[in-house]
Amino acid sequence: MRVEFDRRKFVQLLGVISAEFGLSGKTTTIAAAQEPTHYRSAEISRFRTETINRKNFVGIQVKPFVWMDEGIDKALDTLQEKGNVNTVFAYTYDYDPNRTTQGGPIPLPDHGKYGPAGKLRTGGAFFDYDQKYFRNTSLKDFRSPDEPGFNVITAVAPKMKARKMDFFAWDYNNAFPVMMQSIPGFTEVAEVDVYGRRTTSACFNHPDYRAHLTGKIESYLSQYASEVDGIMWGCERMGPIDNMIGGGWATTGICCFCDFCTAKARTRGISVERAKLGYIQLDKLFQAAAKHERPSDGFFVVFLRTIFEHPEILSWNMLWNDSYHDVRSELYGTAKAIAPKKPFGFHIVQNITFSPFYSAVDNYAKVAEYSDFLKIACYNNAGGPRMSHFVDRLCSTIFADATPEDLQPFYYKVMGYEQASLKNIFTGGLTPQYVTHETKRAITDTGGAVQIYPGIDIDVPSSKGEKHTTPDDVRAATEAAFSAGANGIVLSREYHEMWLANLSAAGETTRKIFG
């Protein structure tokens, strides 16, 4: 099946999305195609009306190598019989270099195979694509060498359809140095930090990178129109302030100060020079905190003084996050122009549940304006040590005057959590109430306009001394999600990490809930 769409309407539609969401950065051609406000609202409402969402949604994320290691039919048998899975988020584009290896820190569960020791995966596309979708970008050669000759879409999707399952392309775009080095031209689209150094993260304002991202969406929905039932897009990136605080999702550099970002800043009336000066001052403060060199007025007071004297710090942080919103809305518009009935949604990084700074700028309500569903990473077992580490980072930067134990009561109050002490959540994880809280928050913030799919923690990797998943944990988290009003769940993080007893607990629980 081949899908054709009107290019003029496509450009017009991107203008509709841009104007409705109040996002900047589109070209003058797109801006000129904007329609009256009443038409824009009706058009966006139509997207949601036309989108076909599966009832009793149970999804799972599956890496490309799984299909080769376990066999496609056997893996699908396991997913259906044990997990009650009806939708697979199959990685079609991935960055992750790691596999479970013999003698490694993460044990192989009771299925699958060990990966080769000492060999990092390169990442890239695990499907074949027509170059015509990438005519407007220099990033054309990105087929992964990891599983040569294996096209996950043509190999897996037909077998899933025969079982009445849905195949969702999982387009995962995290920053990864090996991909930056292996994909021709990727270094040219990299972010530039405040000191003028290129990093390992692509810039959302670089037109080549944006055309690359858009080309993949066109390829999934046009070239593979009969195979792909929906798309989930993800990129676990943060703006400069959250990156400076640090933690598990931090990327290299205080960014971005490339030519495209500085030009965009000037159109907003932001002084590039003062923004740089402010971030350099903030960097010096956090470096002093790392050395326990407390200024006479204290770390928090000097932090406030720095952002008051250099409000461009906050303006630049918003510029980065607005650009992130802008790209995602553009991808949504592309998808809806081609296949309005197919769901297009986003993976939401778990930091939105930890960081008040990240949650303030990448909130559920804003992302819901340009999506059909949100998959929220609310992994409660892994969330314990992750939250504990984040509070440690706060007390190593902005709140370096305090200890984590000092900050914990205030932090819990601000974030609305009722959890155990940091020491106890590190070893015992977070309770199912955390899943309930985040599910309800997402539903409330989005006004029920989009489907909410909480990610259920099933053996998300943990370190020695941290909480490990049990079947009872899975049952409790699954029940918490649905009792809070979730439209479905995504068994997380990866199928190849899950022990079958825990996967079965999810299947048993959803069968009971669905009746």
Each predicted region: which residue ranges?
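Catalytic domains of carbohydrate-active enzymes, especially glycoside hydrolases
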Residues: 74-97, 121, 226-228, 484-488
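N-terminal secretory signal peptides and thylakoid transit peptides that target proteins
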Residues: 1-18
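Aromatic-lined carbohydrate-binding/catalytic grooves of carbohydrate-active enzymes
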Residues: 85-146
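C-terminal segment of N-terminal export signals and the immediately downstream linker at the start
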Residues: 3, 24-55
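Active-site-adjacent "subsite" loops/lids of carbohydrate-active enzymes
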Residues: 55-56, 142-143, 168-223, 252-265, ...
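Aromatic-lined carbohydrate-recognition surfaces of secreted/lumenal glycan-active proteins
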Residues: 168-176, 232-236, 275-282, 321-356, ...
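Aromatic- and acidic-residue-enriched segments that line the glycan-binding/catalytic groove
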Residues: 100-120, 175-197, 234-303, 387-405
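Substrate-binding cleft of secreted/luminal carbohydrate-active enzymes
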Residues: 371-385, 428-441, 445-507
